[in-house]
């Protein structure tokens, strides 16, 4: 735990996805909130079909959802959100003429019902 889900629009061709995931994992690790780097799992999905607003102008987004085991304070969650957002801002060569929206959402996972096993 945690699980980081990153969705990004296909028009963000300059985004180095693997590098961005590693950067976000490092942000989480240095926060001191997670016991081991092995606990952090991240993945990215390129969104081919999307619409931002109603305009036909070029727009895109990166949306990060971080799922955490419940029990962290609002202050800790806010710090994690702001740190991830700051790292996203430095993530890529943003395409000329494309308005890009970046967002981070933290979601609590029920600690009592979460199960995990490591094999190997």
Regions found by a protein language model. Give the residues of each.
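A domain-level signal for the structural core that forms small-molecule/cofactor-binding pockets
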Residues: 2-120
């Amino acid at each position: 735990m945690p699980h980081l889900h990153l969705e990004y629009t296909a028009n963000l061709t300059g985004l180095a996805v693997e590098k961005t995931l590693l950067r976000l994992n490092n942000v989480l690790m240095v926060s001191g909130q997670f016991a081991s780097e092995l606990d952090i799992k991240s993945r990215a999905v390129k969104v081919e079909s999307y619409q931002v607003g109603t305009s036909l102008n070029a727009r895109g987004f990166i949306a990060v959802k971080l799922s955490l085991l419940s029990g962290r304070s609002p202050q800790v969650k806010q710090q994690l959100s702001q740190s991830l957002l700051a790292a996203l801002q430095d993530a890529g060569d943003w395409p000329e003429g494309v308005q890009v929206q970046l967002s981070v959402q933290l979601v609590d996972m029920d600690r009592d019902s979460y199960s995990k096993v490591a094999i190997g």
